[in-house]
From Swiss-Prot:
Belongs to the flavoredoxin family. It comes from the Archaea. Keywords: Flavoprotein, FMN. Pfam families: Flavin_Reduct (PF01613). GO terms for molecular function: FMN binding. SUPFAM superfamilies: FMN-binding split barrel. This is Uncharacterized protein APE_2580. It comes from Aeropyrum pernix (strain ATCC 700893 / DSM 11879 / JCM 9820 / NBRC 100138 / K1). Its cofactor is FMN.
């Protein structure tokens, strides 16, 4: 082995099987493709996922206390850009836009993706700050699978788990790389391509405006007020300001750490 830079750590840990984290609050259902997740305990059965405060799903899970994990088959790979590249904040009903349907879990009523190969209903039990993300710990209350799961194991003759290998690097268009172990079929899908591109660009601009507002503010309260005004100007929910400010503060701390480690 040879030593490489820490900036490559995330890519070293791929490929992984991502989950779609779904949640609902006040009638708004959202979801995001998440690669950073794991089982954390047998008894009680606890699952964990890392989510950044800026993500709309973060707000839904925080405020509802109920969420779900959904595992997808590779046949749904074309739905991934809606789930991983664009925010529910900017594309309301993005799961429906992806051509997917929502059903309700039998125990918690959590929103589940009807086309998923497996789903787990989770009750939020704790949130642990971990740098620029928070780790959400959820106790599993119910699990559902298609018939490809039998005898206590997935049948890979019929189930092709969606796996994620990471993003290609700039310059040039960025692609997310997905694959499945059956035949190692591979797909490269442009990041936020086509009609999703303007929404991804809008998200980048919004994050930039929020970061500038936070830098220009002398207190957190002042920053939240400034971001509320920005959200109102953009036709977005001003109540998201707290989460966006928290994310900007975490990013700033992360930038400082990187600067210190490289100096």
């Amino acid at each position: 082995m040879r030593r490489i830079g820490l900036e490559a750590l995330e890519r070293v840990l791929y490929p992984v099987i991502p989950v779609v984290v779904t949640a609902e609050h006040q009638g708004r259902v959202g979801g995001m493709l998440a690669a950073w997740w794991m089982q954390a305990s047998f008894t009680p059965p606890i699952l964990a996922v890392a989510i950044a405060p800026e993500r709309y799903t973060y707000k839904l899970v925080r405020e509802s206390g109920v969420f779900a994990f959904n595992l997808l088959d590779f046949k749904l790979v074309d739905k991934a850009p809606f789930l991983g590249d664009v925010s529910e904040r900017l594309l309301p009903g993005k799961i429906r836009e992806a051509g997917l349907n929502i059903v309700r879990g039998e125990v918690l009523g959590a929103p589940l993706i009807a086309e998923a190969s497996a789903a787990v209903e989770l009750e939020l039990v704790d949130v642990v700050e971990a740098g620029d993300h928070d780790v959400f710990l959820g106790e599993a209350k119910a699990v559902y699978t298609v018939d490809d799961f039998r005898g206590g194991m997935w049948s890979l003759e019929t189930y092709r788990p969606l796996m994620y290998l990471g993003r290609t690097r700039r310059p040039g268009p960025v692609y997310r790389v997905y694959l499945t172990p059956r035949g190692w079929e591979r797909r490269e899908i442009e990041f936020a391509g086509g009609k999703l591109k303007p929404l991804a660009e809008k998200r980048v601009r919004l994050i930039s405006r929020v970061e500038e507002a936070v830098k220009a503010s002398s207190s957190r309260e002042e920053a939240v007020d400034a971001v509320r005004r920005i959200l109102s100007e953009e036709g977005l929910d001003p109540s998201d300001a707290e989460y966006l400010v928290e994310d900007a503060l975490r990013r700033a701390k992360s930038y400082r750490r990187r600067g210190q480690s490289s100096s």
